[in-house]
Amino acid sequence: MDLYCSFIRISNHVKMSTFILLTLCFYVALSDRSPEYALTKVTEAEDDGNVEAIVENEPDPEDQEIFYPTREWQVVKPGQAVPAGLHMRLNLQTGKNEAKLLEEKEGKDRPKQKRKSSTTSDKYTKKELKEALTKFKEGAEQLSPAEEKDYLQDIKQRFRPIEDLQKAFNDLNINVETDFEIMTKIVNRFNSSSSTTEKVSALYDLEYYVHQVDNAQNLLKLGALQLLINSLNSTDTLLIENSAFVIGSALSSNPKVQIEAFEAGALQKLLVILAADQEVSVKKKTLYALSSMLRQFPYAQQRFMKLGGLQILKNFFKEKNAESLYIRVITLLYDMIMEKMLLYKENNTEQYEQKYQQYNQINLLESITEQGWCPIISDLLRLPENDSREKVLKAVLTLIPLCRAEFLKDCNLLTLLNSLRKEYEGLAAEELRSGEQDGYFSEILSLTISITDKLK
């Protein structure tokens, strides 16, 4: 009986042990399947009640959804696959896991190691490079005429001629239009339309193309330049404004088109618009066209002076709400003055004699002083924009030889120069502290000092 009881007790112990063992196995298997118990490498940190950690998760190919991190904290949904190396925290207020990308200071060591390991394999010594070049040359020299012929034939087979490609496009009903063909369609659209809106739209499209020298000269072949010049006579301000805009873009740094436009009477029409009572937006585009015609074109500058162009520009300073035109006018006059000065310094260019004679007939500086431009220009130093001040300072410095007496009479000018000097001394000092040598503000300060010294 005692033996039987002992057997029963032993059997119960075995059953209990077996049950405990099976329970532990089931628990381990369950925790291994759950992402919440996945092995992680955690660095704990405290941050105002939030528990933060840097986590590197093992990738799980069975995950249905991937977490895409940003620089901001985002909630990590249950079951999402989280990339390695993110900043993780448990938000104690919401009870949810959040993650974001590491800051640069936290993750900068790891990228450095990667860059170091990735670049070492790409380094070659000078000796290795020389040997590679020598072998390359030797290999090229060893090609026989037959091998070279085969090589060229292989190249031809790989790449198709442009004619074949165009034929293929034509077979597919795909027409690759040239700029000339596109411009032809635009001009036809402008010419055939009676709607101002459609005409302005065509001019807008045309202006995009005429910036290129060849396309601008295509206007001559199409007869479109004369069409644009005739549009300057329109009573529609939108048509005038956009026509002048296209003309200005076409004339810019394009001598051939400049000459054609001049001979077609564009200069006179532009001056008429600028002298009339027009909106500032119209005058701005017209002044752009005038500037494009006059630059590097001394014969047009002569005609401009004879037609009273300088006086027309001076009248802008009497108009209301025309401040946006002031600096454009001063910039144009300064450029015209500098063209003549630079020509005298560079007397070794071709056609120098012809240009010298043409520029010598332009008395722009004398006309500026005679027509009372000196105080008008110096007064523009009151403008707040640094770019405007720089352009005015350059003009004032250039005009000192002829405007010196009037500048000295203007007590406000000297006070203004001293104020500008103090302002730009501070700005230039900040540039130097930031390690910038010969910066923008230092240049403006230098101009201010030069003018002040020359007026003493």
Curated annotation (Swiss-Prot):
Gene Ontology terms, MF aspect: adenyl-nucleotide exchange factor activity
One GO cellular component, as annotated: endoplasmic reticulum
Keyword ATP-binding: no
Known glycosylation sites: 191, 233, 347, 386
Gene Ontology biological-process annotations: protein transport
InterPro entries noted in UniProt: ARM-like, ARM-type_fold, Hsp70_NEF-Inhibitors
Keywords assigned: Endoplasmic reticulum, Glycoprotein, Protein transport, Signal, Translocation, Transport
Signal peptide range: 1-31
Location within or outside the cell: Endoplasmic reticulum lumen
Stretch list, region Disordered: 102-124
Major localisation: endoplasmic reticulum
Record has Disulfide bond as a keyword: no
Family: Belongs to the SIL1 family.
Function in brief: Required for protein translocation and folding in the endoplasmic reticulum (ER). Functions as a nucleotide exchange factor for the ER lumenal chaperone HSPA5.
Protein name, per record: Nucleotide exchange factor SIL1
Organism: Xenopus laevis (African clawed frog)
